[in-house]
Amino acid sequence: MRFRRYFSSTFKRLIDCNSCGVKLQNKQPGALGYYTKKDDNLVKKITLEDVKYLIFGQDIQRIKEMTVDTENYDIKLEKPLICKRCSEALHNNKYNATEFKDIPFEEVEKQIPLHSNVVHTAPILEFPFHINSQLLKNRTFNTTMVFTKADRVFKNKKQVQKQIPIFLDAFFETYLNSKATRNIVTSTLNRWNLDTLFSFLHGTNYFVGEPNSGKSTLINALLRRLFGVKIRGNDVKNFELDKQAEEELAVSKKFFLEKQLAGVSHIPNLTRTLQAYKIKQKIIYDLPGYSNYNSYRIDEFIDPKWLQRFRKTSIFSEKRVKKKRYDSIVGNENGKCLTLGGIFYLVPPPTTINQIVCYIPGELRQFHNTDRGIEVLGKSGSKEHPLNKYCGIKPGIGKEKYIRHIIPPFQGPIEVVLKDIGYFSLTPTGKYEYKGLYELWVLDGIDVCIRKPLERVAEDSYDKSQEGKYYIKEPVVSHTYVVAHNDPNPLQTVKESYEKVKERTDEILNKYNLEKFGNNMWHFKW
């Protein structure tokens, strides 16, 4: 009869939470790193053979003739331990946002030695948000810019490998007067450019980015693809697998690898300490995500289930990118609007016909005006509410929680980016004619900008680069303009606001001979 053999690191080595990296303890339930200690007095499952042995134990010959069921005695490998906070967040989507404290960039930067090799990660779908100009301009670091989640923007590998990097090089030179060592665009889901990224890594690398920028997922993809290990202990250079880890590897390579992976969650600030990994002969440090929230956290307003949809790339359908199915909305004098879950309300000018392709999970809904939409969705939350499936906000959210954004005048299609949420494309149909300004009412705490469609600028930059070096010839990104809820003349307010930022915009336009075209109030500043 064969009994289970248990492999556990609980008492054989000092361990951290396999998800967030803090030291585990089982004495103080309310303190940091608490986990529920497993009872070691395990009772083996009683099988029919056990019962037979108890009844006929003295009949040895009869026992030998019986068929022994060893199915319940297979080797069992324990999963890596995680703290209670991470367990509730990862498995039950239950968490207190105050426990996931924001970490300023300055604190993260202190953990990076001077002259280190830095991999700065940012999701390409929310470009140009999440790009840290301070980090890119820091000459004491050798920085590689790595964009993640490319499958949520681009249809194929060619766009990612050959087209968009040309535009990115020109963009950084134009808008930031700075260059990363290189720009690499990746997708862990489709495994785009993972080998390219690894080939550019140095002996020691520090992965830096904002929460949910995809750095931990990127590290996990490299660990799986190239079979790396998580370094436990402080002696990084001389790290070797101990006997227990070697036994685990011998029993199950797949299970062993799962224990090496970085903690990944749609919840920001899950990682709290620096964690090290070794892939072949290269060392990777995963640093906590940094953020500086000066306003409300979106967790206070948006339903946790909707936030999970927005942030989890694995549940995003690529059909949205490839098929580009659109919703239409015709503007009118009453302020007809279109919303996604009450998170934003788009109000087009009267008589304009517009096509919206939303790359954010959720269903769109139209209302008579923003007041009506905010009133209806603000009362949802109960299962009986007829529009509950369209509501992504918590009950009781009123108009005072929204910021009124004005989109600067534009020609042709644009993409509207909502930081930490996603983006949607907006295309007015027919011949261009100015009929008014587009408004966007967005929950406070969500940054908004607009950009030229990334697929289009990627293809355009690639085509023009075949004739020589590519230069950006028109503004490609812009902030929106914030106006008061009751502002009767937003166009005048936009003009006055533009005069305040015009000097910086004109400096860029004149330096690189950019042409304004119809985007004559576009501006962007980090």
UniProtKB/Swiss-Prot annotation:
Its main location: mitochondrion. Residues 105-293 form the CP-type G domain. Residues 1-14 form a transit peptide. InterPro entries: G_CP_dom, GTP-bd, Mito_lipid_metab_GTPase, P-loop_NTPase. It is found in: Mitochondrion. The keyword Mitochondrion applies. CDD domains: YqeH. GO terms for biological process: maturation of SSU-rRNA. Keywords: Mitochondrion, Transit peptide. GO terms for cellular component: mitochondrial inner membrane. GO terms for molecular function: GTP binding. Belongs to the TRAFAC class YlqF/YawG GTPase family. GEP3 subfamily. May be involved in the mitochondrial lipid metabolism. This is Genetic interactor of prohibitins 3, mitochondrial.
